[in-house]
Structures are given as structure tokens and as C-alpha cells.
Amino acid sequence: IHFFYLGLCLLTLTSSAAAGPETLCGAELVDALQFVCGDRGFYFSKPTGYGSSSRRLHHKGIVDECCFQSCDLRRLEMYCAPIKPPKSARSVRAQRHTDMPKAQKEVHLKNTSRGNTGNRNYRM
């Protein structure tokens, strides 16, 4: 059933270019946004920074632009959420500290908690 909606959205969007202005409202608009944006998700109003300030005064959101008026794929894409950058790997410094074997951590903690500040190294 989901593929049916995607096909319907694609058909609606491609036929609108050939047949003239077409509007998307309600579930059709949501399905079209899901199709265009995919896993990124979407906004019903443009995030700050899109378009000029005069345009923001006239248009309140995607319903104004695509339901009350016709819109194209580029207009729909403007409401997609940005692509999230991949999470960076942990720093090497953090890995060294957290990857220390438990026995060495305990000895290290014991030495620092007793106030042993001399050049003595306790190893197991």
C-alpha cells in the first residue's frame, strides 16, 4: 500500500508539469514530502535561513505554497530536513582512558587517592 502512495505521488508530481498546475493537500502532501525527503524527514514551515525575508512575510509554510498554490519538486525539497553528518569517532585520548584494564585503573586510583605523589609506580 505504501508503494501505491509513492507511485501516486510521483505520478501526481510528474503529471503536474505536463498537465498544468496541481496542488497537494493533506495526506497527498505528506506522502509527497515523505517520498522526496526520505529518511531525512521534513518541516511544515521552512527553517530559518531559507529564502528572503520578504518571502517569509508572504508564505507561512508548505500548505500555503503547495496546497493553496501549486508547487514543484524543488519547492518540496526546501522543506526537507538537512542531512545529518555522521557521528565522529571518539578521540584517542578518551579511548586510552576508558580502555585501560580494570586492575590498572584500581591501582592508579588507589595511588592518587592516598596522595602518593612521589615517583613510585605500582604495577600489577
Curated annotation (Swiss-Prot):
GO terms for molecular function: growth factor activity; hormone activity; insulin-like growth factor receptor binding. Residues 82-89 are annotated as: D. Residues 1-19, 90-124 form a propeptide. The keyword Disulfide bond applies. Residues 86-124 are annotated as: Disordered. Residues 96-109 have a biased composition (Basic and acidic residues). Residues 20-48 are annotated as: B. It comes from the Eukaryota. GO terms for biological process: cell population proliferation; insulin-like growth factor receptor signaling pathway; negative regulation of apoptotic process; negative regulation of release of cytochrome c from mitochondria; positive regulation of cell population proliferation; positive regulation of phosphatidylinositol 3-kinase/protein kinase B signal transduction. Residues 49-60 are annotated as: C. Coiled coil: none annotated. Pfam families: Insulin. This is Insulin-like growth factor 1. It comes from Coturnix japonica. The lineage of its organism: Eukaryota, Metazoa, Chordata, Craniata, Vertebrata.
